[in-house]
Regions:
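A well-structured
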Residues: 1-158, 482-491
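Contiguous, non-catalytic segments that form substrate-binding/exosite surfaces or channel walls
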Residues: 101-249
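Short alpha-helix carrying the canonical HExxH Zn2+-binding catalytic motif
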Residues: 246-262
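A conserved active-site cap/scaffold subdomain adjacent to cofactor or substrate pockets
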Residues: 258, 265, 276-365
Length: 491
């Protein structure tokens, strides 16, 4: 075998083990008995040790050194780019530190869940302090003399810096605040009332997953506390949650996660269990979930279809017509929870977390002061006070499991989705007629061809520019939100 073939065989086994780690994580969130947490933490730490050893195996460096990348085709060069980046990053982090992070974050997830249930941030603060210290140590190893937060960002959005995000978000925040203020002055649409059987919600939500092209022969939809997607290639799983008085939470969580899942399912099978067999970045991943959920799923055309589906599932639920239903689905409402926020306000939740986590990593904010800082920023941005920790600083799992640098990719995904949506609609003039019939094939097909099939072949910015014909920027998102909510609220 050639050095390249040897390297790719090694990568395939490593990717397979990584998928096993993902299945353990999925099980931890969905099926695992509560009493198994300590053992699962040990299992995941052991597997992380094996993965770290493989990722830092000196043979990888030898293979990389002996391969002439110039002699490879585009796909081969991209594989080498990913492998080299991952090897260099993994080699900078001591194995003992990687294993400790895996163990501590696995245990921290349980501590966070208990503290959240008790609305007690003080009970979680020591654990969060330990997680942040470990992640900061990892970031310092990765950054060398560079910016620690920037080094952390590379795990989720290669090529992006905190300063670039700060500039983009700085342009976005005042526009969102201005539009939000105008909407709050306008007459609000009615709210959904009544109760909706949770079993019927799950039945309809699985139908919606299929409507959006999710392949249930290679996936499944289950319930979890925090909706997420897991896996790649031939095994891609999504979760959702139900609320008897808010079926939209279930349906749109599912559509969102199906956007992630469809991305993974639609990557070229040629890339299966290789570095290219995954999304280009978390921001690009989020662009798919957001465009499925919002630009497609919350469009006037598609909500007309969903209205009919809900009437079939639940009977008369007190909404007179499809136009009223559309307004209810897109109602701008006060609320504390990021994952339940409407399109207009969602990014304000993310920008707050971006600023707070940067301050935590730079030591400008201490964990002891985090809850107060959160509450102050929330009241400044939203105009009302956080009522309890589970609705505030404890609502998200991310920091407990060490996902520092992840939050900004949510808004970056919305920015990317804005660019993609403009290009998609320009190329599909009959799209709304299709969506009104529940036919998403043209939209999902366009995204599959333009974005999803390529997996990690291109760098994130390159993916968006090739697909949309423009460099990533916030202007299309601002145009989309201004037009949509201006129309909805008569601004």
């Amino acid at each position: 075998m050639t050095a390249f073939a040897d390297l790719m065989a090694h990568q395939r086994e490593t990717q397979a083990l990584s998928q096993v780690m993902g299945r353990l994580g999925w099980d931890q969130e969905t099926m695992m008995p509560r009493g198994a947490a300590a053992q699962r933490a040990e299992e995941m730490a052991a597997l992380e040790g094996v993965l770290h050893s493989r990722r830092t195996d000196p043979k990888v460096a030898e293979w990389l050194e002996s391969i002439d990348a110039a002699g490879l085709d585009e796909v081969g060069r991209a594989q080498i780019r990913h492998i080299r980046r991952a090897y260099e990053r993994a080699s900078k982090v001591p194995a003992a530190l990687a294993a400790r992070i895996a163990r501590v974050t696995s245990e921290a997830q349980g501590t966070w869940a208990e503290a959240r249930a008790e609305d007690d941030f003080a009970a979680f603060a020591p654990t969060l302090t330990e997680v942040l210290a470990l992640k900061r140590e990892e970031g310092q190893a990765l950054a060398a003399s560079g910016n620690v937060y920037d080094a952390m960002l590379q795990d989720y959005e290669p090529g992006t810096t905190g300063a670039e995000l700060e500039a983009m978000f700085g342009a976005l925040r005042p526009e969102l605040s201005k539009l939000r203020a105008a909407v709050r002055e306008a007459k609000a649409p009615p709210q959904l009332t009544g109760t909706f059987d949770e079993g019927a919600q799950m039945k309809l939500t699985r139908q919606l997953a299929r409507t959006f092209g999710y392949d249930m022969s290679h996936g499944r939809v289950d319930k979890a506390v925090h909706p997420f997607s897991s896996g790649s290639g031939l095994d891609v799983r999504v979760t959702t949650r139900t609320n008897p008085t808010d079926p939209f939470n279930c349906f749109y969580s599912t559509i969102h996660e199906v956007g992630h899942g469809a991305y993974e399912q639609n990557i070229s099978r040629d890339y299966l269990l290789t570095p290219l067999g995954q999304g280009a970045s978390m921001g690009v991943h989020e662009s798919q979930s957001r465009i499925y959920e919002n630009q497609i799923g919350r469009s006037r055309a598609f909500t007309g279809f969903l209205f009919a589906q809900m009437k079939e599932a639940f009977g008369d639920f007190g909404v007179a017509d499809a136009e009223t239903f559309y307004k209810i689905v897109n109602r701008v409402s006060d609320g504390f929870i990021r994952t339940e926020a409407d399109e207009l306000q969602y990014n304000l939740h993310v920008l707050m977390r971006f600023d707070l986590e940067r301050a935590l990593i730079s030591h400008d904010l201490q964990v002891a002061d985090l809850e107060a800082a959160w509450n102050d920023r929330f009241e400044a941005d939203f105009g009302y006070a956080v009522d309890k920790a589970s609705n505030g600083v404890l609502q998200d799992v991310h920091w407990s499991v060490g996902l520092i640098g992840y939050f900004p990719t949510y808004t970056l995904g919305n920015v990317y989705a804005g660019c993609l949506n403009e290009a998609m609609r320009a190329g599909l003039p009959e799209l709304d007629a299709d969506l009104a019939q529940g036919n998403t094939a043209a939209a999902t097909g366009w995204l599959q061809q333009s974005v999803q099939q390529h997996g990690g072949l291109f760098e994130p910015r390159e993916v968006i520019e090739k697909a949309s014909g423009m460099p990533p920027n916030e202007a299309p998102l601002i145009r989309y939100l201004s037009q949509k909510f201006g129309d909805l609220y008569g601004l």
